[in-house]
Amino acid sequence: MSIRPEEISAILKEQIERYQSEVEVSNVGSVIYVGDGIARVYGLQGAMAGELLEFTGGTFGMVLNLEEDNVGAVLLGEYNHIKEGDVVKATGRIMEVPAGSAMLGRVVNALGQPIDGKGPINTTAFRPLEKVAHGVVTRQPVTTPMQTGLKAIDSMVPIGRGQRELIIGDRQIGKTAIALDSIINQREKKDLICIYVAVGQKQASIAGIAAKFEEMGAMDYTIIVAATASEPAPLLYMAPYAGVAMAEEFMEAEGKDVLIIYDDLSKHAVAYREMSLLLRRPPGREAYPGDVFYLHSRLLERACRLNPDHGGGSITALPIIETQAGDVSAYIPTNVISITDGQIYLEADMFNAGQRPAVNAGLSVSRVGGSAQTKAMKSVAGQLRLDLAQYRELAAFAQFGSDLDKATLARLTRGERVTEILKQGQYQPMPVQEQVVSIYSGVNGYLDDIPRDKVGEFEVDFLKFMRSANADVLNAIKDTGKIDDATEQKLIKAINEFKSTFAV
């Protein structure tokens, strides 16, 4: 058999033409230090701030410091197997979290991974952790109410959709309870998506909250983002941004209204301080880094109400801050107070005296919520604030004098009754029309002759009576959002009719 050279050359040419080379270019570096949840990596040219890095063993990290000869990264998982000299690969991707309707009813960690044992989450929507907040042109003013179901708040510190309202107070005085009641109150309409971000809380507490939401039927429209106390600081730092990224998917892509709760931003700031000090950033006041204000302002500025041209959705943010011994002039509390559109101040003395929710009406304020309040609530809330202010002023003097004139006694009596009316149990949010008739009966003096210890009982029975015999009055307030003359006359008649049957 003779081999012809031209055949061999033809075969070789064909093989060469068919050959395809695939060159994969990776940006790689090596670990020069690892420990305390952070790593320093040498040789990553062109790394971006916030970029995702892949370490050996599948652990991911996020770039936070870009320095002259290395990058500082925080590690998002187990790092005991990572050692000096290990290869690190830059992914070229910014940190993202899954989003969309598939997340509803689930408990996820700060990376958006499910931790509730209900299987994987199937979603194609992803959102970047960091995003520039919407500008002035795309926003519109706050005009729609966000009902919390709590009389003390919906009347005196009203919250509108798209607002940022701070809940501030000492530990264990009902801050989280207000936030949870606000979520549970949405179960009737279910037109508000709720996201509860737990930062640095006990796992048992989060399990309890999830169980309560399931029991109350609130989990259908809620996502819980949990970064527990046992998790590394980077995950605690990321959790609020993950929550607001999920909220933006609903607001921008679907035009929906979202309520997001950050519980709490004090622990968030502490986690950021820990990371910053480990990354050797210069410390400032209370050892917080210089950009701790920006940490919270860029988060809370992402809450807004979009105009109809951009979908008309909204994000309402309720950040929580824990104070030490009522000190609202500390660093983090003053920062967040200046960023938000008002604050609900909870007082330990009121809580211990049995006034729950312990909202201090004098120190609490809502800067933009007033324009979102319904006319019916506005008509009773003005008198309510006045009655409480006069009562607080007189109650201090009444402790010293026994012989008070009739006008002073009448004001004290009215204040006591109104204070009783504002009491409300946990997990018992109330529809706005029932709140209005309760407060109306208090501020217009119909409870002045009811003993103080019977006011709560009177209110419960009176609302049952209104639901059964005077549902038309409640429906009129609900549908029109105001109390017209005809409705008011019916309401007065109903109050007097019930009072005649109420056994004191």
Swiss-Prot record:
Reactions accelerated catalytically: ATP + H2O + 4 H(+)(in) = ADP + phosphate + 5 H(+)(out)
Subcellular location: Cell membrane
Protein name (Swiss-Prot/TrEMBL): ATP synthase subunit alpha
Annotated site location: Required for activity: S364
Keyword flag Nucleotide-binding: yes
EC number: 7.1.2.2
Enzyme class: translocase
Assembly and interaction partners: F-type ATPases have 2 components, CF(1) - the catalytic core - and CF(0) - the membrane proton channel. CF(1) has five subunits: alpha(3), beta(3), gamma(1), delta(1), epsilon(1). CF(0) has three main subunits: a(1), b(2) and c(9-12). The alpha and beta chains form an alternating ring which encloses part of the gamma chain. CF(1) is attached to CF(0) by a central stalk formed by the gamma and epsilon chains, while a peripheral stalk is formed by the delta and b chains.
Source organism superkingdom: Bacteria
GO CC entries: plasma membrane; proton-transporting ATP synthase complex
Similarity field: Belongs to the ATPase alpha/beta chains family.
GO MF term set: ADP binding; ATP binding; proton-transporting ATP synthase activity, rotational mechanism
Organism of this sequence: Syntrophomonas wolfei subsp. wolfei (strain DSM 2245B / Goettingen)
UniProt key word Nucleotide-binding: yes
Mode of membrane association: Peripheral membrane protein
Keyword terms: ATP synthesis, ATP-binding, Cell membrane, CF(1), Hydrogen ion transport, Ion transport, Membrane, Nucleotide-binding, Translocase, Transport
Gene3D superfamilies: 2.40.30.20, ATP synthase alpha/beta chain, C-terminal domain, P-loop containing nucleotide triphosphate hydrolases
Function comment: Produces ATP from ADP in the presence of a proton gradient across the membrane. The alpha chain is a regulatory subunit.
Native organism taxonomy: Bacteria, Bacillati, Bacillota, Clostridia, Eubacteriales
Residues that hold ATP according to the record: G169, D170, R171, Q172, I173, G174, K175, T176
